[in-house]
Amino acid sequence: MEVSKEEFLRQFGGDYGYPGAPKGVDEMRAAEFKRLEGMAYLDHAGATLYSEAQMADVLKDLASNVYGNPHSQSDSSMAASDLVTAARHQVLKYFNASPREYKCIFTSGATAALKLVGECFPWSRESCYMYTMENHNSVLGIREYALSKGATVLAVDVEEGADLAKDNGSYSLYKISRRTNQRRSKDVLSHNCQNGSLSDISGNNWNIFAFPSECNFSGQKFSLSLVKLIKEGKIPLQQQGKWMVLIDAAKGCATEPPNLTVYPADFVVCSFYKIFGYPTGLGALIVKNEAANLLNKTYFSGGTVAASIADIDFVQKRKNIEQVLEDGTISFLNIASLRHGFKIIEMLTTSAIERHTTSLATYVRNKMLDLKHSNEINVCTIYGQQYSKVEGLKMGPTITFNLKREDGSWFGYREVEKLASLFGIHLRTGCFCNPGACAKYLGLSHSDLVSNFEAGHVCWDDNDIINGKPTGAVRISFGYMSTFEDAEKFLKFLQSSFVSLPVQFNNGYMLNLNSLNLIDNSSQKAVSDIHLKSIIIYPVKSCQGFSVKSWPLTTGGLMYDREWLLQGSGGEILTQKKVPELGSIRTLIDLELGKLFIESPTRRDKLQLSLLESLADLSEEVDVFGQRYEVQSYDDRVNTWFSEAIGRPCTLVRCSSSKYRSCTYTGLRDRPCRDTQSKLNFVNEGQLLLISEESISDLNSRLNSGKGDCKQKLPVDAMRFRPNLVISGSSPYSEDNWKKLRIGEACFTSMGGCNRCQMINLHQDSGQVLKSKEPLATLASYRRKKGKILFGILLNYEDIMEGENETIAGRWLQVGQQVYPSTE
């Protein structure tokens, strides 16, 4: 046993691995989660995993029994109804909720349960919707219903005292501070009132206080004693009226479901895939009877009415609250599968799961806090409650963090995510749909958030650092089947990828993590030895290119290069990262015939397109990597050909012009501004990509040394990187230092290194697309610079002639031409 595991077990052996259960975690992992071999799945806050036995039981159940629509009275329907009833009781039992006091309403998920509360709650102009800052967007969304009825909305910060573990239900243990009141303008409310959507005050006005049992951003657990304090009106910020409490348990219920007998909240929401992985698309609203009677549902549907008449205004809703609130036929087969998911939870017990996952999170958290660069700067900034290594008692099995370089600047979370994927580590990045916690912990002001949005940052994009600040974070989270080996794999990943060691020099190379190797200029070959070895044109973006001996240049670079692209049915740009099948489509241009030839192994007929064809009547605009383009579309014949070739609906468009704009990216980390005077076809950044044979040879020697992850040890050729120009005769990576270069009579400016992604790990072999971690994993070990993995350089063609026609006539590239670089 390794020393680190011995150390871990000495501290956490009583909690880790389910020592009192029929199966320990290692035995369970080997039997039920064989698919996890070689990877560390650390996104259980997003979705935990289903076990093999669970899915086998589900399949056996469905294969052995007949379940009919529970709205019927047949034997199969009654069997389904009985299972639904049993499932309701099992869910209530999980939350220790008495069936006499609570009802279980099945929904399509926690979000649907929250929406149901928001739209059915009796909001009035005297109501207040109060929620903690650390709430999911789905909880924040309820405010739209409250605001539309004239209610006040208030976000609050809740800080818990150090002695809360001795909980005596005292408000003095909390510090609650308010944010700005939110109310709709009088004009909007007046419009709503005229349309009958404002409620008059009649009797008691009702209010809601919402908080998560565990914050999905940071893992901070909120004390459930808030339930009693709110319901007893002991919080000074509470206005008059009756208060209901809503708990978002979507994250927390996987390890510590709220005990509703002890803490009788009015509404609790959950999603079952967060607990045991399957089924997805199924959640529940656990609602107290008194609160359920308040919910006034306007819409009625199949299954919710006792009687209705089609041609007059008559409807009588059912008395059973579950039937009133569950529209249409519920997902009865998914509901029937819940019992198979609960089996393993009941075998292990939630208290043991909580101890197991917390032991892993506490161990990793403490180790992360120990990580320092060679200059003693802390590597990890962890978000959540302020804790020491001894007290982490209020944290769930979630760690959210950002990483710093030795100079104090931030690693972008997308860089962390990209590198983690190469190590087989699955984690989550961004703000996790929790804008309040994200802004609070990252120190982002309202103006920061607005300016980030105006700079182009939206959820799920790659803008991870703006104006020197992170826009999101990295999150790892543990589940009931997580192991020490998962934790150790993650820690080794951090150590090897982000911790800077003292600088050493060896044969002219700087050996320092997170920075690019320097080149020993004394070993560079004579400039006269460098020549152009290959020219490759890629007419259709992400499809195969073709090699030529010579080719004309235009203001956009190589003529017809990346002048076409494919869009999906939703208008999205299709690339090999999304559609690997694009790599099997071959292209060829015959300049004399004026035709583009396209063929696919899945199509017998070849497609021919005229280079001079006018498609002006079908002009439209698209956005590609932040650049607006005017494009021309093709007819159904062409689109059908491509759709059948790649196996999904798509359309082909051709670039007719790009709309130039000034650089708007000055605030973004190391993002090069496009030259607004240069025409760009559908390229990501530069007009051309250049790589050298010597750099490829050096990469292959590293791959063959066994240090990489490439099992087959096959050499990587130039085409894996989709270059336009391949040169020969230089030293490895000497192109990194070039500012300008001349090939023949054509001049180019270097736009810097090309940032590589997982697309270079795709390999076409005998018509199949093979995926591996190489060569990107090896490149990441020595070609990283400020969040980018660089290989090759991007070039822009310097058009020194006036007029595009003169450029076409006067500038050709030819294989064999000398290359004259300049570093000044």
From Swiss-Prot:
Its cofactor is pyridoxal 5'-phosphate. One of its GO terms (molecular function) is molybdenum ion binding. Pfam families: Aminotran_5, MOSC, MOSC_N. The modification N6-(pyridoxal phosphate)lysine is found at residue 274. Transmembrane segments: none annotated. Residues 655-822 form the MOSC domain. One of its GO terms (biological process) is monocarboxylic acid metabolic process. Its EC number is 2.8.1.9. InterPro entries: Aminotrans_V_dom, MoCF_Sase_C, MoCo_sulfurase, MOCOS_middle, PyrdxlP-dep_Trfase, PyrdxlP-dep_Trfase_major, PyrdxlP-dep_Trfase_small, Pyrv_Knase-like_insert_dom_sf. Pathway: Cofactor biosynthesis; molybdopterin biosynthesis. It catalyses: Mo-molybdopterin + L-cysteine + AH2 = thio-Mo-molybdopterin + L-alanine + A + H2O. It is an enzyme of class 2 (transferase). Keywords: Molybdenum cofactor biosynthesis, Pyridoxal phosphate, Transferase. It comes from the Eukaryota. The active site is at residue 433. Belongs to the class-V pyridoxal-phosphate-dependent aminotransferase family. MOCOS subfamily. Sulfurates the molybdenum cofactor. Sulfation of molybdenum is essential for xanthine dehydrogenase (XDH) and aldehyde oxidase (ADO) enzymes in which molybdenum cofactor is liganded by 1 oxygen and 1 sulfur atom in active form. PANTHER family: MOLYBDENUM COFACTOR SULFURASE, MOLYBDOPTERIN COFACTOR SULFURASE MOSC. This is Molybdenum cofactor sulfurase. It comes from Oryza sativa subsp. japonica.
